[in-house]
Amino acid sequence: MKTPGVLLLILGLLASSSFAIIRIPLRKFTSIRRTMTEVGGSVEDLILKGPITKYSMQSSPKTTEPVSELLKNYLDAQYYGDIGIGTPPQCFTVVFDTGSSNLWVPSIHCKILDIACWVHHKYNSDKSSTYVKNGTSFDIHYGSGSLSGYLSQDTVSVPCKSDQSKARGIKVEKQIFGEATKQPGIVFVAAKFDGILGMGYPHISVNNVLPVFDNLMQQKLVDKNIFSFYLNRDPEGQPGGELMLGGTDSKYYHGELSYLNVTRKAYWQVHMDQLEVGNELTLCKGGCEAIVDTGTSLLVGPVEEVKELQKAIGAVPLIQGEYMIPCEKVSSLPTVYLKLGGKNYELHPDKYILKVSQGGKTICLSGFMGMDIPPPSGPLWILGDVFIGSYYTVFDRDNNRVGFANAVVL
């Protein structure tokens, strides 16, 4: 018969053998759009130069459908975290983006005229003992040019842990990623992040590269194949939030999680029943498709419908696609209701109006933006951080579903 002490030891060993949740602190930064506006720059030329896509309109060999989503989202990305690539880890700040599926960072071999490369961390394969050459070229087309480079293989550490912090991390071995040697235009010069870590489905991965989270699942590095986001919407609040790999944390939400099935395994796409602006306006009549995208800070919809929405809340065009509302009117604006899975998700005006500094003054911007995504991928609504900040969000690959619960205010 085992003694109580031995039993406790066995239970302790069993408990330690299970995987804890991996926590990646997120920091909030000023978006590219706001940075360029502050210095008097313009992104309108970029926006007007044709289809501005996160990824090229190329097809996976498994499908004849082109897959695309818009780079315009990255102009408004606001949250990033740290990862490491190589052994020992070389640290990079990346946007954890559920609207794409590839990992890329700048390369030490970037072109001499690539200004964005100068001001960001660069991966150096010579400094990694786990680097394996791949060399396949990759090309991600944008409206003003293309982000290009070649693929490499190495170990990805999440989080980076080069600071010897005590936070538990994981190492994803043999991960294929992009070394970017050329970045387009001036857009990424203003970016506070080095690269992108896509967390969408493999279907939209350029060059059919296995996404980091899929590789992590294959290597059985987490107990549950889910990840979740808490975003701190306090403009002054740090940390900016937390990404959890392998689980959820109830301290970040109250009530129960409500789930929606993914309708297409490319982006994290779900069905939206409708969107209402107070009692004045109903959009997405008869239902529409929406993607849950951590890579954009805004709530985006078809141009004509969003024009109606902006009018209903009294927003007027400012510059660079932004709409402004007099700050003194914010408290009297209507509540916006997104109906998902038969349940209403409320966005009160203090949640969808963004207070930002411009020219030393505080102005109030609409958190909605119009953008048309053509068939076959579109039309789509994009539920960005304006929505995710109010609702703790769970991305469940085991059951191909997305969960929402009311986020707490820390």
Curated annotation (Swiss-Prot):
Known function: Acid protease active in intracellular protein breakdown. Plays a role in APP processing following cleavage and activation by ADAM30 which leads to APP degradation.
Protein name (database record): Cathepsin D
Pfam families assigned to the protein according to its UniProt record, in alphabetical order: A1_Propeptide, Asp
UniProt GO MF annotations: aspartic-type endopeptidase activity; aspartic-type peptidase activity; endopeptidase activity; hydrolase activity; peptidase activity
S-S bridge residues: C91-C160, C110-C117, C284-C288, C327-C364
Similarity remark: Belongs to the peptidase A1 family.
Subunit-structure text: Consists of a light chain and a heavy chain. Interacts with ADAM30; this leads to activation of CTSD. Interacts with GRN; stabilizes CTSD; increases its proteolytic activity.
GO biological process, one term: proteolysis
Keywords, ordered alphabetically: Aspartyl protease, Disulfide bond, Glycoprotein, Hydrolase, Lysosome, Protease, Secreted, Signal, Zymogen
Signal peptide (from-to): 1-20
